[in-house]
């Protein structure tokens, strides 16, 4: 049984899906498509020799990790990939803190990095998950600063809650590590 069928209670649409919200199966496909695009791009880096999909392994499921990257010098790092279809137009990262009373992926991942992939533009932001959690915690404590920076709590669909964080704000913090484009130059927006 794979990770997704294990977590999905029913093959029926949720109430939110029936009301015109996103569709779980479509979101899952979009996420997997995004992961494959990013995986191919990672393999193109000269220092990378392999990108292993561990998302359905015990470690991948328990630690919420999508890929293990193997480098030429022998070291490895792990990544959780988030594919976002709206960030290019909203200008926000979506930090899902809770989903159906469970910690959201950014709140629970043990990956070394979050690769936040903007599907429409190909931009991939490399974020530090520990520092991202700390940053969100600080914003929850300093509501005035959060308001000034336009970071806001929001519902994110049925059973989900989190924060919208402006991309430009996060890029100026130590959460942001670097950025690259997943698409060949000819396809970049």
Name each region found by the language model.
Residues 2-56, 85:
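Acidic-basic catalytic patches of nuclease active cores, encompassing PD-(D/E)XK
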Residues 2-10, 14, 22, 26, ...:
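Non-catalytic C-terminal interaction segments of nucleic acid-processing enzymes
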Residues 33, 62, 109:
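Short, well-structured alpha-helical interface segments that form or flank functional binding sites
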Residues 48-49, 115, 149-153:
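Assembly/interface hotspot detector across virion components, adhesins/toxins, and nucleic-acid enzymes
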């Amino acid at each position: 049984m794979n990770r997704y069928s294990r977590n999905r209670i029913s093959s029926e649409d949720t109430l939110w899906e029936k009301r015109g919200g996103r569709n779980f199966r479509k979101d899952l496909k979009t996420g997997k498509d995004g992961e494959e695009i990013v995986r191919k791009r990672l393999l193109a880096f000269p220092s990378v020799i392999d990108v292993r999909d561990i998302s359905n392994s015990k470690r991948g499921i328990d630690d919420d990790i999508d890929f293990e990257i193997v480098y030429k010098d022998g070291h490895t790092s792990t990544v959780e990939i988030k594919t976002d279809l709206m960030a290019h137009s909203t200008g926000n990262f979506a930090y899902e803190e809770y989903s159906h009373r469970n910690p959201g992926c950014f709140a629970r991942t043990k990956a070394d990095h979050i690769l936040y992939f903007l599907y429409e533009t190909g931009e991939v932001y490399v974020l530090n998950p520990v520092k991202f959690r700390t940053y969100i915690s600080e914003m929850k404590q300093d509501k005035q600063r959060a308001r000034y920076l336009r970071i806001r709590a929001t519902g994110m669909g049925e059973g989900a809650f989190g924060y919208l964080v402006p991309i430009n704000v996060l890029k100026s913090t130590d959460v942001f590590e670097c950025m690259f484009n997943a698409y060949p130059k000819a396809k970049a927006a």
